Amino acid sequence: MPHQQILMLFGLLPVATNISTWWNFGSMLLACLTLQLLTGFFLAVHYTANINLAFSSIIHITRDVPYGWMMQNLHAIGASMFFICIYIHIARGLYYGSYLNKETWLSGTTLLIMLMATAFFGYVLPWGQMSFWAATVITNLLTAIPYLGSTMTTWLWGGFAINDPTLTRFFALHFILPFGIISLSSLHILLLHEEGSSNPLGTNSDIDKIPFHPYQTYKDMLMLTIMTIMLLTIVSFFPDIFNDPDNFSKANPLVTPQHIKPEWYFLFTYGILRSIPNKLGGALALTMSIMMLLTLPFTHTSKLRSMMFRPLMQLTFWTFTATFLVISWTATKPVEPPFTTISQVAALMYFLFFISNPIMGWLENKIMKL
């Protein structure tokens, strides 16, 4: 296909006239992925995956490599931006019923799992105190699996404790997974354009559409500019805002940090894990906190797609959002009353959202006589 025809095809891509700013986060995620790949490549060039040299190599990157500090900060804060965008992207999908486009939703949830795995492996690489202990706590959860747990943990560690082989394979996984994310993102976009984007009203968009260019391209560029300004402001003025003070010390297996906690974007899953006083139960709850998203296309009972005209479901959704924030907050606190009770109630409410979704839909149908 000639170059002009491809451009024309892209320019004439029909898009619903009424899609709001919440639909811009997909293109922002693509920008985040590109940024992470570029900065990640330049960091990998200078990084050494060895337990004796990893921490020193990060210091070398920030001090000696030209613009290394910028690459490192862009990569670390870019990951936070990535998760901010993906959580908003998922929230929009929940609110406006985008999950009814099953294939797109299921591929997107798989992308989220891959992204979380990549971020976890990346957090271990600097080999600071919190990196080491976060890796120890999370990989230890595999031992909760009956029969196979211990074997799987030893296999993942490459020995009987977290050591040099663990760091090497985590670096390899952190390097290879983004290529899987690129492939799956392409599939995600392909599946989306089979049916086309939904819109805030949840109606069929075919009756009123406009060309993608110039309307949506300018809208995308505006949001990307805002995100870039935010990113560069944080990198320039508050580069350590998301960092844990413990991670500025080299990993020491003999000294346990007073309070082990992951990066902010994993706090809600960690909070759910900690709220259950049983290892296997906690590991299952942690897994289910993400896997429950896969059930949404199959439990939608309402005759209306979007929550725009569903006040009961709106109340449920915003309660769910508040619950997400409360769990994240309690996960930063020590395991003692009242935080344990708050996190247990919040974890229960988190899962109740997925149970109440079909019930609320059925109830609204009855009330509105649909």
Swiss-Prot record:
Stored PROSITE patterns: CYTB_CTER, CYTB_NTER
Cofactor annotation: heme b
A biological-process GO annotation: mitochondrial electron transport, ubiquinol to cytochrome c
Keywords: Electron transport, Heme, Iron, Membrane, Metal-binding, Mitochondrion, Mitochondrion inner membrane, Respiratory chain, Transmembrane, Transmembrane helix, Transport, Ubiquinone
CDD domains given in the database record: cytochrome_b_C, Cytochrome_b_N
GO molecular function: metal ion binding; ubiquinol-cytochrome-c reductase activity
Any one cellular-component term (Gene Ontology): respiratory chain complex III
Binding site for heme b b562: 75, 174
Subunit structure of this chain's protein: The cytochrome bc1 complex contains 3 respiratory subunits (MT-CYB, CYC1 and UQCRFS1), 2 core proteins (UQCRC1 and UQCRC2) and probably 6 low-molecular weight proteins.
UniProt-recorded name of the protein: Cytochrome b
Organism this protein belongs to: Chilabothrus strigilatus strigilatus (New Providence boa constrictor)
Phylogenetic classification of the source organism: Eukaryota, Metazoa, Chordata, Craniata, Vertebrata
Protein encoded by which gene: MT-CYB
